[in-house]
Regions:
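Sec/Tat signal peptide C-region and signal peptidase I cleavage site
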Residues: 15-19
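Active-site neighborhoods and metal-handling regions in enzymes and metal-associated proteins
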Residues: 20-320
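Sec-dependent N-terminal signal peptides
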Residues: 4-13
Length: 320
């Protein structure tokens, strides 16, 4: 049986076993909690000052979490617990963040519990009392018309919060949109240092998926490859934050439609020599995500490299 060689258009990485580079879950949890504490102490004060927000309130009930609130939970918490209320106050005298969890217990090691249940049996009363004691100029809540991630407070929680707030505090309510987006998009130096390895792991998974170990021309389908990527990511101890996609461009009479290739492609489209294969995958690790797309060309019999037209197209595209 003739073997077909795959030429990866983008750069390749070494053959190091990426599964051996992924930390055990227990070690990952330690990293996640350390990185979270660094983020709260290191970047949140500057972001709140920049966005002119001195009090940020996040409220979620268990299993219906605000996506931003979830980023403040410790690694062992897979969801909020009952009703979780977090308050971050930027002290103007010290310039430091005061962290409070109006909850039955501390939220990990980073956010201590601040609910005196004997004095304030009603959790909402405890929240309002804490906010009032800080005399904030703004009370930022996660609601937004434009950014879904910054629109995490539910209708019920929003209405209850307004109901309990006195008029003097209610008029200070503002959208936390700019702060929520800034929190999600800003990374610490330590997180940035992790990203090259995370990108490399993603490329290595793609490299293996584009190899003869996985693809047999005339037999392997795009859906076979999609599910191979999904399973390989899981087997490596990683997660994926969106379902992988694999599409094909080939010489035929059908005009290529990128929307159809993404959402309405044949699930059993068999890979053939001469195909230009495209993959889009993203992995999650230590609460960081990648989003990587690569192409590969499947050589026709007698070819030793991709056609000049394809090489030229990628040379021009890679200038960006």
């Amino acid at each position: 049986m003739q073997k077909f060689i795959f030429i990866l258009i983008l750069c390749l990485f070494g053959r190091t076993s990426y599964s051996q580079e992924v930390l055990p879950l227990r070690e990952q949890a330690k990293w996640v909690d350390e990185l979270l504490n660094e983020r709260i102490e290191g970047i949140l004060p500057g972001l709140m000052k920049r966005e002119q927000i001195d009090c940020w309130v996040l409220i979620s009930r268990e299993y219906n979490e605000d996506p931003v609130l979830k980023t403040f939970l410790p690694a062992e918490w897979l969801s909020a617990r009952r009703r979780t209320m977090l308050v971050f106050y930027l002290n103007p005298q010290t310039g430091k963040i005061e962290k409070h969890a109006i909850a039955r217990y501390a939220v990990g090691k980073s956010i201590p519990a601040s609910w005196d249940m004997q004095k304030y049996p009603d959790q909402w009363d405890a929240l309002v009392q804490l906010i009032a004691s800080k005399h904030p100029t703004t009370i930022a809540i996660n609601y937004s018309n434009d950014f879904a991630h910054a629109d995490g407070i539910t209708h019920t929680e929003f209405d209850l919060f307004k109901k309990y707030l006195p008029d003097s505090l209610r008029k200070k309510m503002v959208s936390a949109e700019s702060l929520a987006v800034a929190w999600l998009e800003t990374r610490t130096e330590r997180e940035i240092a992790i990203y090259p390895k995370l990108i490399q792991l993603t490329h290595q998974i793609i490299q293996e998926g584009f190899s003869e170990k996985v693809i047999t021309p005339g037999i392997t389908s795009t859906d076979d490859l999609v599910w191979w990527f999904r399973q390989r990511i899981r087997n490596a101890g990683l997660d994926t934050w969106f379902h992988p996609s694999v599409s094909i461009q080939r010489k035929d009479s059908v005009v290529f439609d990128h929307l159809k290739a993404f959402s309405d492609r044949p699930r059993e489209d068999i890979l053939q020599p001469g195909d230009l294969i495209h993959v889009d995958i993203g992995i999650s690790y230590l609460r960081l995500q990648t989003d990587v797309q690569e192409h590969a060309y499947l050589l026709l019999p007698g070819e030793t490299q991709a056609p000049a037209s394809i090489q030229q197209a990628f040379s021009k595209a890679n200038r960006l």
